[in-house]
Amino acid sequence: MSNLTPSIAVIGAGSWGTSLAILLAGKGYPVRLWGHNKEHIDRLISDGENSRYLPGISLPESLYPTPSLEKAVLGAQLVLMVVPSHVFRTVFRDLIPFLPIDCQIVSAVKGIENSTLSTMHMVMAQELAAYPALALIELGVISGPSFAKEVAQKQPTAVTVGFASADTAKKVQDIFSTDYFRVYTSTDIDGLEISGAFKNVMAIAAGISDGLSYGSNARAALITRGLAEMQRLGAAMNADPATFAGLSGLGDLLLTCTGDLSRNRNVGLQLGKGHSIEHIESEMFMVAEGVKTTKSFYDLARKLDVETPILDEVYHIIYEGKDCSQAVQDLLGRKLKPE
């Protein structure tokens, strides 16, 4: 990455993408924010804010919304991927022809691709493998407990940036860090992605518990045993165990399972109150990654032969229509064992 002020492309103009674009542009970086919906992008330009996702928060002068992937990506030293996991590969594949040969790309997406069970870092690596001329591009992730609205409001937040190279992680850490947005570094990309995605499933479980009007004891048990499932999956994928006690693991798990801004917890709340997943999704205008990620992790756990009882019950509720109260009883009725 050049020592000059880097040009940054943020791919995805939802709440999280816009929030990160505001943060980076607020530091004086020239930021181009891409969205697939031209009408939405035109509205960002005319309103000077993302009134759909972050109303009342102004876009800095150095933030330039665009519906053109080419205009967004050409010349960017840092590319930030912030689109839903189910369209991630398609969007990434479309922007590859415009990538500079030595840029850094960071995924800010917490999900697992359904069809391949790949993390977003894996998806990027798979797609770039067909382009030897882009072999110098470095891939990383950013993860941690970070509601978009609070980041856009400049409320104190801490996250972790991960790259295979500690030096590159440090460079990207410096780009993102502010007096309200503290960034740590890691080289455990797999651990960051597994924990960041899996916590969304546990947030649905916690929401179901709350929707059934269970108390704090039940929520604490779900979070703790959910962390154990996360750790078992991480071990099967050779992740660093310490990552799961960090910001992307326990930190994000606590936030998403308890915070009122959590879309995944809200899905669980509505399920617990008896609403169908079809009804819940029809009422949402923002993506809850945990719904699709539940299926990905369910399939992955079967593939890796990892025991994930809470994940399994969330899957049965969402994809098989199992009664939520029965799922809880089945969890509590499992064979007793040591912790």
Curated annotation (Swiss-Prot):
Pathway recorded for this protein: Membrane lipid metabolism; glycerophospholipid metabolism
Main EC class the enzyme belongs to: oxidoreductase
Entry's EC annotation: 1.1.1.94
Keywords from the named record: Cytoplasm, Lipid biosynthesis, Lipid metabolism, NAD, NADP, Nucleotide-binding, Oxidoreductase, Phospholipid biosynthesis, Phospholipid metabolism
GO MF term list: glycerol-3-phosphate dehydrogenase [NAD(P)+] activity; NAD binding
Stored Pfam families: NAD_Gly3P_dh_C, NAD_Gly3P_dh_N
Catalytic activity as recorded in UniProt: sn-glycerol 3-phosphate + NAD(+) = dihydroxyacetone phosphate + NADH + H(+); sn-glycerol 3-phosphate + NADP(+) = dihydroxyacetone phosphate + NADPH + H(+)
Binding locations of NADPH: 15-16, 36, 110, 148, 263, 287, 289
Residues reported in the UniProt entry to bind sn-glycerol 3-phosphate: 110, 144, 146, 199, 252, 262-264
Entry annotation: catalytic residues: 199
InterPro entries in the cross-refs: 6-PGluconate_DH-like_C_sf, 6PGD_dom2, G3P_DH_NAD-dep, G3P_DH_NAD-dep_C, G3P_DH_NAD-dep_N, NAD(P)-bd_dom_sf
Transmembrane segments: none
Origin: domain of life: Bacteria
Recorded GO CC terms: cytosol
Subcellular location per the Swiss-Prot or TrEMBL entry: Cytoplasm
Predominant subcellular localization, coarse grouping: cytoplasm
Biological process terms in GO annotation: carbohydrate metabolic process; glycerol-3-phosphate biosynthetic process; glycerol-3-phosphate catabolic process; glycerophospholipid metabolic process; phospholipid biosynthetic process
Family: Belongs to the NAD-dependent glycerol-3-phosphate dehydrogenase family.
Protein role: Catalyzes the reduction of the glycolytic intermediate dihydroxyacetone phosphate (DHAP) to sn-glycerol 3-phosphate (G3P), the key precursor for phospholipid synthesis.
Protein name: Glycerol-3-phosphate dehydrogenase [NAD(P)+]
Organism expressing this protein natively: Desulfotalea psychrophila (strain LSv54 / DSM 12343)
Lineage per the UniProt record: Bacteria, Pseudomonadati, Thermodesulfobacteriota, Desulfobulbia, Desulfobulbales
